Regions:
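Feature captures hydrophobic
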Residues: 1-174, 180, 187
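A short acidic, Gly/Pro-enriched loop at the edge of an enzyme's catalytic core
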Residues: 250-264
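Conserved SAM-binding strand-loop segment of SAM-dependent methyltransferases
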Residues: 236-251
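Substrate-binding/catalytic lobe of Class I Rossmann-like enzymes that use SAM or dcSAM, i.e.
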Residues: 300-411, 418
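Conserved beta-strand signature within the Rossmann-like core of class I S-adenosyl-L-methionine
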Residues: 292-300
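Conserved class I S-adenosyl-L-methionine
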Residues: 190-198
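A short glycine-rich, Lys/Arg-flanked "PGG" loop and its adjoining helix->strand segment in the class I
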Residues: 279-291
Protein backbone atom coordinates (compact mmCIF):
# COMPACT_ATOMS: atom_id res chain seq x y z
CA UNK A 1 0.00 0.00 0.00
CA UNK A 2 2.78 2.44 0.87
CA UNK A 3 4.44 1.78 -2.47
CA UNK A 4 1.24 2.65 -4.31
CA UNK A 5 0.92 5.98 -2.51
CA UNK A 6 4.58 6.73 -3.14
CA UNK A 7 4.06 6.17 -6.86
CA UNK A 8 1.06 8.52 -6.88
CA UNK A 9 2.96 11.25 -5.02
CA UNK A 10 5.89 10.95 -7.43
CA UNK A 11 3.54 11.77 -10.32
CA UNK A 12 1.33 14.20 -8.41
CA UNK A 13 3.89 16.64 -6.94
CA UNK A 14 5.01 18.81 -9.84
CA UNK A 15 5.01 22.18 -8.03
CA UNK A 16 7.33 22.76 -5.07
CA UNK A 17 8.63 19.98 -2.84
CA UNK A 18 6.89 17.75 -0.29
CA UNK A 19 8.71 15.67 2.32
CA UNK A 20 6.80 12.65 3.63
CA UNK A 21 7.68 10.92 6.91
CA UNK A 22 6.34 7.36 6.57
CA UNK A 23 5.12 5.05 9.37
CA UNK A 24 8.11 2.73 8.83
CA UNK A 25 10.54 5.53 9.69
CA UNK A 26 11.64 6.35 6.14
CA UNK A 27 11.61 9.88 4.74
CA UNK A 28 10.99 10.61 1.06
CA UNK A 29 11.02 13.88 -0.86
CA UNK A 30 8.85 14.52 -3.90
CA UNK A 31 9.04 17.32 -6.43
CA UNK A 32 11.79 19.77 -7.22
CA UNK A 33 13.93 21.78 -4.82
CA UNK A 34 12.39 25.23 -4.28
CA UNK A 35 14.62 27.42 -6.42
CA UNK A 36 12.03 29.84 -7.78
CA UNK A 37 10.79 33.05 -6.13
CA UNK A 38 7.53 33.15 -4.22
CA UNK A 39 4.56 34.57 -6.02
CA UNK A 40 3.43 38.10 -5.12
CA UNK A 41 0.59 38.56 -2.70
CA UNK A 42 -2.79 38.36 -4.48
CA UNK A 43 -4.41 40.60 -1.88
CA UNK A 44 -3.12 42.92 0.87
CA UNK A 45 -1.84 41.10 3.92
CA UNK A 46 -1.28 37.72 2.29
CA UNK A 47 2.27 36.60 1.48
CA UNK A 48 3.61 34.24 -1.15
CA UNK A 49 3.10 30.50 -0.89
CA UNK A 50 5.39 27.95 0.77
CA UNK A 51 7.45 25.87 -1.65
CA UNK A 52 8.90 23.27 0.72
CA UNK A 53 6.47 21.49 3.05
CA UNK A 54 6.22 18.18 4.83
CA UNK A 55 3.89 15.87 6.71
CA UNK A 56 4.02 12.69 8.76
CA UNK A 57 1.72 9.68 8.35
CA UNK A 58 1.64 7.92 11.71
CA UNK A 59 0.15 4.52 10.84
CA UNK A 60 -0.20 2.18 7.87
CA UNK A 61 -4.00 2.07 8.19
CA UNK A 62 -4.15 5.73 7.21
CA UNK A 63 -2.31 4.97 3.98
CA UNK A 64 -4.97 2.44 3.02
CA UNK A 65 -7.75 4.91 3.76
CA UNK A 66 -6.09 7.65 1.70
CA UNK A 67 -5.69 5.34 -1.29
CA UNK A 68 -9.32 4.22 -1.10
CA UNK A 69 -10.98 7.64 -0.58
CA UNK A 70 -8.47 10.52 -0.48
CA UNK A 71 -10.99 13.39 -0.35
CA UNK A 72 -12.54 12.03 2.83
CA UNK A 73 -9.58 10.21 4.40
CA UNK A 74 -7.07 13.06 4.29
CA UNK A 75 -9.42 15.36 6.20
CA UNK A 76 -10.26 12.69 8.76
CA UNK A 77 -6.59 11.83 9.28
CA UNK A 78 -5.63 15.47 9.81
CA UNK A 79 -8.49 15.99 12.27
CA UNK A 80 -7.56 12.79 14.15
CA UNK A 81 -3.87 13.70 14.27
CA UNK A 82 -2.87 10.64 12.21
CA UNK A 83 -1.42 12.98 9.58
CA UNK A 84 0.44 16.04 10.89
CA UNK A 85 2.29 18.88 9.13
CA UNK A 86 6.06 18.84 9.64
CA UNK A 87 8.14 21.99 9.31
CA UNK A 88 5.22 24.03 8.00
CA UNK A 89 1.74 25.21 8.90
CA UNK A 90 -1.45 23.45 7.89
CA UNK A 91 -2.14 26.36 5.56
CA UNK A 92 1.27 26.02 3.87
CA UNK A 93 0.79 22.27 3.41
CA UNK A 94 -2.68 22.55 1.93
CA UNK A 95 -1.73 25.52 -0.22
CA UNK A 96 0.94 23.49 -2.02
CA UNK A 97 -1.25 20.38 -2.23
CA UNK A 98 -4.09 22.40 -3.76
CA UNK A 99 -1.74 23.96 -6.31
CA UNK A 100 -0.61 20.51 -7.37
CA UNK A 101 -4.19 19.23 -7.44
CA UNK A 102 -5.23 22.07 -9.74
CA UNK A 103 -2.29 21.30 -12.01
CA UNK A 104 -2.98 17.56 -12.22
CA UNK A 105 -6.60 16.68 -11.39
CA UNK A 106 -7.98 17.68 -14.77
CA UNK A 107 -5.62 15.41 -16.70
CA UNK A 108 -5.32 12.44 -14.37
CA UNK A 109 -7.91 9.70 -15.14
CA UNK A 110 -8.55 9.03 -11.43
CA UNK A 111 -9.25 12.71 -10.85
CA UNK A 112 -11.66 12.87 -13.78
CA UNK A 113 -13.46 9.73 -12.61
CA UNK A 114 -13.80 11.07 -9.06
CA UNK A 115 -15.31 14.32 -10.35
CA UNK A 116 -17.79 12.45 -12.54
CA UNK A 117 -18.89 10.19 -9.68
CA UNK A 118 -19.20 13.15 -7.33
CA UNK A 119 -21.42 15.04 -9.74
CA UNK A 120 -23.56 11.96 -10.38
CA UNK A 121 -24.26 11.50 -6.66
CA UNK A 122 -24.79 15.13 -5.71
CA UNK A 123 -28.60 15.17 -6.00
CA UNK A 124 -28.73 12.32 -3.50
CA UNK A 125 -26.39 14.11 -1.09
CA UNK A 126 -28.32 17.36 -1.51
CA UNK A 127 -31.81 15.93 -1.09
CA UNK A 128 -33.01 18.40 1.51
CA UNK A 129 -36.70 18.06 2.43
CA UNK A 130 -37.80 20.30 5.28
CA UNK A 131 -37.05 17.80 8.07
CA UNK A 132 -33.56 17.05 6.79
CA UNK A 133 -32.84 20.74 6.21
CA UNK A 134 -33.58 21.41 9.88
CA UNK A 135 -31.15 18.66 10.96
CA UNK A 136 -28.49 19.88 8.53
CA UNK A 137 -28.70 23.43 9.85
CA UNK A 138 -28.57 22.26 13.46
CA UNK A 139 -25.42 20.24 12.69
CA UNK A 140 -23.42 23.42 12.09
CA UNK A 141 -25.29 26.40 13.48
CA UNK A 142 -26.59 24.98 16.75
CA UNK A 143 -23.08 24.50 18.13
CA UNK A 144 -22.09 26.19 21.38
CA UNK A 145 -22.88 29.86 20.88
CA UNK A 146 -19.53 30.93 22.33
CA UNK A 147 -17.68 29.34 19.42
CA UNK A 148 -18.87 31.86 16.85
CA UNK A 149 -18.21 34.83 19.13
CA UNK A 150 -14.56 33.72 19.31
CA UNK A 151 -13.77 34.08 15.60
CA UNK A 152 -16.53 36.10 13.90
CA UNK A 153 -16.99 39.87 14.08
CA UNK A 154 -19.04 41.43 16.87
CA UNK A 155 -22.21 41.26 14.74
CA UNK A 156 -21.67 37.52 14.03
CA UNK A 157 -21.74 37.91 10.27
CA UNK A 158 -20.99 34.36 9.08
CA UNK A 159 -20.70 35.25 5.39
CA UNK A 160 -18.40 37.06 2.98
CA UNK A 161 -17.40 40.58 4.00
CA UNK A 162 -16.81 43.45 1.57
CA UNK A 163 -13.24 44.77 1.34
CA UNK A 164 -13.15 47.96 -0.74
CA UNK A 165 -9.40 48.48 -0.17
CA UNK A 166 -8.23 45.32 1.61
CA UNK A 167 -7.04 47.29 4.64
CA UNK A 168 -10.36 47.25 6.52
CA UNK A 169 -10.82 45.52 9.84
CA UNK A 170 -13.22 42.58 9.86
CA UNK A 171 -15.84 44.71 11.61
CA UNK A 172 -15.52 47.46 9.00
CA UNK A 173 -15.70 45.02 6.08
CA UNK A 174 -18.76 43.23 7.45
CA UNK A 175 -20.52 46.53 8.02
CA UNK A 176 -19.65 47.52 4.44
CA UNK A 177 -21.14 44.23 3.21
CA UNK A 178 -24.45 44.91 4.93
CA UNK A 179 -24.71 48.43 3.53
CA UNK A 180 -23.66 47.24 0.06
CA UNK A 181 -26.56 44.78 0.14
CA UNK A 182 -28.94 47.37 1.59
CA UNK A 183 -28.10 49.69 -1.31
CA UNK A 184 -29.05 47.01 -3.82
CA UNK A 185 -32.35 46.46 -2.02
CA UNK A 186 -33.30 50.04 -2.96
CA UNK A 187 -34.55 50.97 0.51
CA UNK A 188 -35.61 54.41 -0.65
CA UNK A 189 -38.14 55.06 2.12
CA UNK A 190 -38.80 53.90 5.69
CA UNK A 191 -41.46 51.36 6.51
CA UNK A 192 -40.68 48.89 3.71
CA UNK A 193 -41.33 45.30 4.78
CA UNK A 194 -38.28 43.06 4.27
CA UNK A 195 -38.12 39.27 4.44
CA UNK A 196 -34.71 37.92 5.51
CA UNK A 197 -34.42 34.24 4.47
CA UNK A 198 -31.76 32.56 6.57
CA UNK A 199 -31.42 35.46 8.99
CA UNK A 200 -28.60 33.98 11.09
CA UNK A 201 -28.09 35.77 14.40
CA UNK A 202 -30.08 38.77 13.17
CA UNK A 203 -27.33 41.20 12.19
CA UNK A 204 -28.64 42.04 8.72
CA UNK A 205 -32.23 42.41 9.90
CA UNK A 206 -31.24 44.71 12.75
CA UNK A 207 -29.10 46.85 10.44
CA UNK A 208 -31.96 47.27 7.95
CA UNK A 209 -34.33 48.28 10.75
CA UNK A 210 -31.93 50.46 12.72
CA UNK A 211 -30.27 52.28 9.82
CA UNK A 212 -32.93 52.26 7.08
CA UNK A 213 -36.24 52.25 8.94
CA UNK A 214 -37.34 48.91 7.48
CA UNK A 215 -39.74 46.45 9.05
CA UNK A 216 -38.07 43.04 8.91
CA UNK A 217 -39.27 39.46 9.26
CA UNK A 218 -36.38 37.04 9.60
CA UNK A 219 -36.68 33.27 9.25
CA UNK A 220 -34.17 30.58 10.23
CA UNK A 221 -34.02 26.85 10.91
CA UNK A 222 -31.54 27.20 13.78
CA UNK A 223 -32.98 27.30 17.30
CA UNK A 224 -29.73 28.77 18.66
CA UNK A 225 -29.75 31.57 16.10
CA UNK A 226 -33.43 32.28 16.71
CA UNK A 227 -32.85 32.66 20.45
CA UNK A 228 -29.87 34.98 19.96
CA UNK A 229 -31.59 37.07 17.27
CA UNK A 230 -34.66 37.63 19.44
CA UNK A 231 -32.50 38.53 22.44
CA UNK A 232 -30.53 41.07 20.41
CA UNK A 233 -33.73 42.61 19.05
CA UNK A 234 -35.10 43.06 22.55
CA UNK A 235 -31.85 44.52 23.87
CA UNK A 236 -31.76 47.10 21.05
CA UNK A 237 -35.42 48.02 21.52
CA UNK A 238 -36.35 47.09 17.96
CA UNK A 239 -39.18 44.65 18.72
CA UNK A 240 -41.63 46.97 16.98
CA UNK A 241 -39.70 46.65 13.72
CA UNK A 242 -38.10 43.20 13.72
CA UNK A 243 -39.53 39.73 14.28
CA UNK A 244 -37.89 36.32 13.86
CA UNK A 245 -39.49 32.94 13.22
CA UNK A 246 -38.34 29.32 13.07
CA UNK A 247 -39.60 28.66 9.56
CA UNK A 248 -38.57 26.90 6.35
CA UNK A 249 -38.76 29.06 3.20
CA UNK A 250 -41.04 26.44 1.63
CA UNK A 251 -43.62 27.01 4.37
CA UNK A 252 -43.99 30.74 3.69
CA UNK A 253 -46.94 30.29 1.34
CA UNK A 254 -48.76 28.07 3.84
CA UNK A 255 -48.11 30.36 6.80
CA UNK A 256 -48.95 33.64 5.07
CA UNK A 257 -50.55 32.88 1.67
CA UNK A 258 -51.56 36.50 0.98
CA UNK A 259 -48.54 38.32 2.42
CA UNK A 260 -46.23 40.13 -0.01
CA UNK A 261 -42.90 41.62 1.00
CA UNK A 262 -41.50 44.84 -0.46
CA UNK A 263 -37.98 43.47 -0.29
CA UNK A 264 -36.43 40.01 0.19
CA UNK A 265 -32.82 39.34 1.16
CA UNK A 266 -30.97 36.06 1.60
CA UNK A 267 -27.31 36.04 2.67
CA UNK A 268 -25.27 32.85 2.97
CA UNK A 269 -28.31 30.55 3.04
CA UNK A 270 -28.66 29.44 -0.59
CA UNK A 271 -25.66 27.11 -0.22
CA UNK A 272 -27.87 24.91 1.99
CA UNK A 273 -30.80 24.65 -0.43
CA UNK A 274 -29.46 21.81 -2.61
CA UNK A 275 -29.52 21.68 -6.40
CA UNK A 276 -32.76 19.69 -6.53
CA UNK A 277 -34.59 22.45 -4.64
CA UNK A 278 -33.51 25.56 -6.57
CA UNK A 279 -36.84 25.79 -8.41
CA UNK A 280 -38.78 25.61 -5.13
CA UNK A 281 -36.60 28.33 -3.61
CA UNK A 282 -37.06 30.85 -6.42
CA UNK A 283 -40.75 30.03 -6.74
CA UNK A 284 -41.10 30.81 -3.02
CA UNK A 285 -39.26 34.11 -3.49
CA UNK A 286 -41.42 35.00 -6.49
CA UNK A 287 -44.66 34.29 -4.62
CA UNK A 288 -43.58 36.28 -1.56
CA UNK A 289 -42.25 39.32 -3.44
CA UNK A 290 -44.48 42.33 -4.14
CA UNK A 291 -44.99 42.99 -7.88
CA UNK A 292 -42.81 46.11 -7.56
CA UNK A 293 -40.45 44.52 -5.05
CA UNK A 294 -36.70 43.85 -5.11
CA UNK A 295 -34.79 40.80 -3.84
CA UNK A 296 -31.07 40.24 -3.30
CA UNK A 297 -29.39 36.82 -3.16
CA UNK A 298 -25.83 36.64 -1.75
CA UNK A 299 -24.26 33.17 -2.01
CA UNK A 300 -21.07 31.22 -2.67
CA UNK A 301 -20.66 29.95 -6.21
CA UNK A 302 -18.24 28.10 -8.47
CA UNK A 303 -16.19 29.82 -11.12
CA UNK A 304 -15.68 26.88 -13.51
CA UNK A 305 -19.09 25.27 -13.89
CA UNK A 306 -20.95 22.56 -12.01
CA UNK A 307 -19.10 20.40 -9.50
CA UNK A 308 -19.64 18.47 -6.29
CA UNK A 309 -19.13 19.12 -2.60
CA UNK A 310 -16.15 17.55 -0.87
CA UNK A 311 -17.29 14.41 0.96
CA UNK A 312 -15.38 15.58 4.05
CA UNK A 313 -17.27 18.90 4.06
CA UNK A 314 -20.56 17.04 3.55
CA UNK A 315 -19.91 14.63 6.41
CA UNK A 316 -18.41 16.94 9.03
CA UNK A 317 -19.23 20.57 8.22
CA UNK A 318 -22.24 21.24 5.96
CA UNK A 319 -24.43 18.17 5.34
CA UNK A 320 -26.55 18.70 2.24
CA UNK A 321 -24.62 21.80 1.19
CA UNK A 322 -23.59 22.78 -2.32
CA UNK A 323 -22.08 25.92 -3.87
CA UNK A 324 -23.50 26.17 -7.41
CA UNK A 325 -22.21 27.71 -10.60
CA UNK A 326 -24.15 30.61 -12.06
CA UNK A 327 -25.08 28.31 -14.95
CA UNK A 328 -27.02 26.22 -12.41
CA UNK A 329 -28.72 29.19 -10.73
CA UNK A 330 -29.95 31.28 -13.66
CA UNK A 331 -32.23 28.66 -15.30
CA UNK A 332 -34.43 28.19 -12.19
CA UNK A 333 -34.57 31.98 -11.82
CA UNK A 334 -35.87 32.23 -15.37
CA UNK A 335 -38.40 29.44 -14.79
CA UNK A 336 -39.73 31.22 -11.69
CA UNK A 337 -40.65 34.33 -13.64
CA UNK A 338 -38.21 36.52 -11.70
CA UNK A 339 -35.90 38.89 -13.56
CA UNK A 340 -32.17 39.10 -12.79
CA UNK A 341 -31.64 42.88 -12.80
CA UNK A 342 -28.02 42.90 -11.62
CA UNK A 343 -25.24 40.37 -10.95
CA UNK A 344 -21.98 41.16 -9.15
CA UNK A 345 -19.12 38.72 -8.57
CA UNK A 346 -17.01 39.11 -5.41
CA UNK A 347 -13.79 37.17 -5.95
CA UNK A 348 -11.11 37.44 -3.25
CA UNK A 349 -13.35 39.11 -0.67
CA UNK A 350 -14.22 35.79 0.98
CA UNK A 351 -10.57 34.69 1.06
CA UNK A 352 -9.78 37.82 3.06
CA UNK A 353 -12.80 37.27 5.30
CA UNK A 354 -11.73 33.74 6.17
CA UNK A 355 -8.15 34.87 6.73
CA UNK A 356 -9.48 37.12 9.50
CA UNK A 357 -11.53 34.23 10.90
CA UNK A 358 -8.50 31.91 10.90
CA UNK A 359 -6.39 34.43 12.81
CA UNK A 360 -9.09 34.99 15.42
CA UNK A 361 -9.67 31.25 15.76
CA UNK A 362 -5.93 30.71 16.31
CA UNK A 363 -5.81 33.49 18.91
CA UNK A 364 -8.66 31.83 20.84
CA UNK A 365 -7.72 28.20 20.20
CA UNK A 366 -7.12 27.31 23.86
CA UNK A 367 -10.55 28.63 24.83
CA UNK A 368 -12.23 26.74 21.97
CA UNK A 369 -10.36 23.54 22.86
CA UNK A 370 -11.69 23.87 26.42
CA UNK A 371 -15.25 24.10 25.06
CA UNK A 372 -14.78 21.15 22.68
CA UNK A 373 -11.40 19.38 22.30
CA UNK A 374 -8.25 19.38 20.18
CA UNK A 375 -9.79 17.19 17.51
CA UNK A 376 -12.61 19.68 17.00
CA UNK A 377 -10.06 22.48 16.71
CA UNK A 378 -8.05 20.57 14.11
CA UNK A 379 -11.24 19.83 12.17
CA UNK A 380 -12.39 23.44 12.21
CA UNK A 381 -8.93 24.75 11.33
CA UNK A 382 -8.89 22.44 8.32
CA UNK A 383 -12.34 23.68 7.28
CA UNK A 384 -11.19 27.30 7.44
CA UNK A 385 -7.92 26.62 5.61
CA UNK A 386 -9.60 24.61 2.85
CA UNK A 387 -12.32 27.25 2.45
CA UNK A 388 -9.87 30.13 2.17
CA UNK A 389 -7.79 28.29 -0.40
CA UNK A 390 -10.89 27.54 -2.49
CA UNK A 391 -11.31 31.29 -2.95
CA UNK A 392 -7.62 32.12 -3.31
CA UNK A 393 -7.17 29.54 -6.06
CA UNK A 394 -10.15 30.81 -8.07
CA UNK A 395 -12.41 27.78 -7.83
CA UNK A 396 -15.01 29.64 -5.74
CA UNK A 397 -16.43 33.15 -5.57
CA UNK A 398 -19.48 34.95 -4.17
CA UNK A 399 -22.29 36.19 -6.38
CA UNK A 400 -24.89 38.80 -5.55
CA UNK A 401 -27.95 38.54 -7.77
CA UNK A 402 -30.54 41.31 -7.65
CA UNK A 403 -34.01 40.06 -8.59
CA UNK A 404 -37.34 41.68 -9.39
CA UNK A 405 -40.73 40.87 -10.87
CA UNK A 406 -40.88 44.10 -12.85
CA UNK A 407 -38.39 45.70 -15.25
CA UNK A 408 -39.03 49.07 -13.61
CA UNK A 409 -38.46 47.99 -10.00
CA UNK A 410 -34.81 49.09 -9.93
CA UNK A 411 -32.88 52.07 -11.38
CA UNK A 412 -31.62 51.82 -14.95
CA UNK A 413 -27.93 51.99 -13.97
CA UNK A 414 -25.73 51.11 -10.99
CA UNK A 415 -25.03 54.76 -10.26
CA UNK A 416 -27.45 54.72 -7.32
CA UNK A 417 -25.42 52.22 -5.27
CA UNK A 418 -22.70 54.51 -3.78
CA UNK A 419 -25.19 57.15 -2.61
CA UNK A 420 -27.65 54.54 -1.37
CA UNK A 421 -24.97 53.07 0.93
CA UNK A 422 -25.01 56.32 2.89
CA UNK A 423 -28.75 56.56 3.20
CA UNK A 424 -28.74 55.17 6.75
CA UNK A 425 -30.20 58.35 8.20
CA UNK A 426 -33.13 56.98 10.19
CA UNK A 427 -32.34 56.83 13.88
CA UNK A 428 -33.99 54.36 16.21
CA UNK A 429 -36.17 57.19 17.50
CA UNK A 430 -37.35 58.10 14.02
CA UNK A 431 -38.03 54.45 13.28
CA UNK A 432 -40.51 54.27 16.14
CA UNK A 433 -43.11 55.93 13.89
CA UNK A 434 -43.32 52.86 11.62
Amino acid sequence: MQGALEAILKRFITIGRVTVHWPDGRTTRYGAAPDFPTQPAPTPGHGGFAQDVGFQIRDARTIRHILFDPELAVGEALADGRVVPVGCTLYDLFDLIVRNYRANAGVHPVGRLRNLLGRAARRLHQYNPATRSRRNVAHHYDLNGRLYSLFLDRDRQYSCAYFATGSETLEEAQSAKKHHIAAKLCLDRPGLHVLDIGCGWGGMALTLARDYGARVTGITLSSEQLFEARARTASEGLDHLVTFELLDYRALADRTPHRRFDRIVSVGMFEHVGIGHFDAFFEAVGRALHPDGVALLHAIGRTHGAGHTSPWITKYIFPGGYCPALSEVLPPIERSGLIATDIEILRLHYAETIRHWRRRFAANRDTIAAIYDDRFCRMFELYLVASELAFRHESHMVFQIQLARSQTATPLTRDYIPSAKHRAVFSTTENSRF
